[in-house]
Amino acid sequence: MALRIGVLCGGRSAEREVSLRSGEAVYQALMAAGYNDVVKIDVGYDLVEQLKGNEIQVAFLALHGKYGEDGTIQGLLEMLDIPYTGSGVLASALAINKIATKKIFKMEGIPTPAFSVITKKEVEDKSLQEAALRAIKEVGVPAVVKANTQGSTIGITFVHVKEKMAEAIESALKYDQDVLVEQFVAGTEVTASVLGNNSPEALPLIEITSVTGVYDYQSKYTPGMSDHIIPPRLPQDIQEKIKELAIKSFLSLGCRGLGRIDFIIRDNQPYALEVNTLPGMTATSLFPDAANYAGISFPELTDRLIKLALEQ
């Protein structure tokens, strides 16, 4: 196919190595799908020169974390008039902002765990202890304290007892001006992959379980401590409800192309946690795994994502 595709990967975020693996997998899949003119680009300060020099006609984003899924690279590509895979500037910026995402969930009537917002200014104007007491009053313990716009492994603390709340907030404030304190909901974790633009579809759900048999947030964020079960061990009507909420979440933020929405299910009630606009794209990642179960091979998936990018 006479279309020059640039696979953008690497970058400067803490998830650089994962992004490089995603980039290589996507490169191979696009070639297998029949795209013969594909260039891998390690994103750096010379990105504009690389895009222009290689005469890139469409960008496949295999980036993760800061500068990749926060709207930054999307804005640059918009200025250069280069179509790209995944969500646009606003949806990307909203999805990486955990607090903004939670507020949108609340406005749209999408169930989500209770939360409290702590700002650096509040801590400076009042005190760390006062902010911690407010979070405990509004959310309670156990809770998860998260830096607002960091990746899932950075600036996160699981708080079991009230006495540790202030310390967790202080730690998160090292990474961000705003902190999300979220109620911990024990239950089954399920991730929903969504594919499409204006009329997206939810792919088969994947249940994520702890290898130790005890589910908690730490299991979620520790590599090698979780297994993927597809389809999840949930009643069919609950699975359909999760898919509906996933599509609603996707559209509420204005996402397009692809996205992955994480849920916790307790007593058959799904709670939306967050939206990932650029999920991992190695052949064994969650999103391609869900697509594969739906009968969409990895090469076919990359082809569909390119076509969705060109629809915009």
Curated annotation (Swiss-Prot):
SMART domains: GARS_A (SM01209). Binds 2 magnesium or manganese ions per subunit. It comes from the Bacteria. It is found in: Cytoplasm. It catalyses: 2 D-alanine + ATP = D-alanyl-D-alanine + ADP + phosphate + H(+). InterPro entries: ATP-grasp, ATP_grasp_subdomain_1, D-Ala_lig_Van_CS, D_ala_D_ala, Dala_Dala_lig_C, Dala_Dala_lig_N, PreATP-grasp_dom_sf. GO terms for molecular function: ATP binding; D-alanine-D-alanine ligase activity; metal ion binding. Pathway: Cell wall biogenesis; peptidoglycan biosynthesis. GO terms for biological process: cell wall organization; peptidoglycan biosynthetic process; regulation of cell shape. Mg(2+) 2 binds at E274, N276. It is an enzyme of class 6 (ligase). SUPFAM superfamilies: Glutathione synthetase ATP-binding domain-like (SSF56059), PreATP-grasp domain (SSF52440). Its EC number is 6.3.2.4. ATP binds at residues 136-191. GO terms for cellular component: cytoplasm. Mg(2+) 1 binds at D262, E274. Residues 102-307 form the ATP-grasp domain. Its main location: cytoplasm. Keywords: ATP-binding, Cell shape, Cell wall biogenesis/degradation, Cytoplasm, Ligase, Magnesium, Manganese, Metal-binding, Nucleotide-binding, Peptidoglycan synthesis. Coiled coil: none annotated. Its cofactor is Mg(2+); Mn(2+). Cell wall formation. Belongs to the D-alanine--D-alanine ligase family. This is D-alanine--D-alanine ligase. It comes from Desulforamulus reducens (strain ATCC BAA-1160 / DSM 100696 / MI-1).
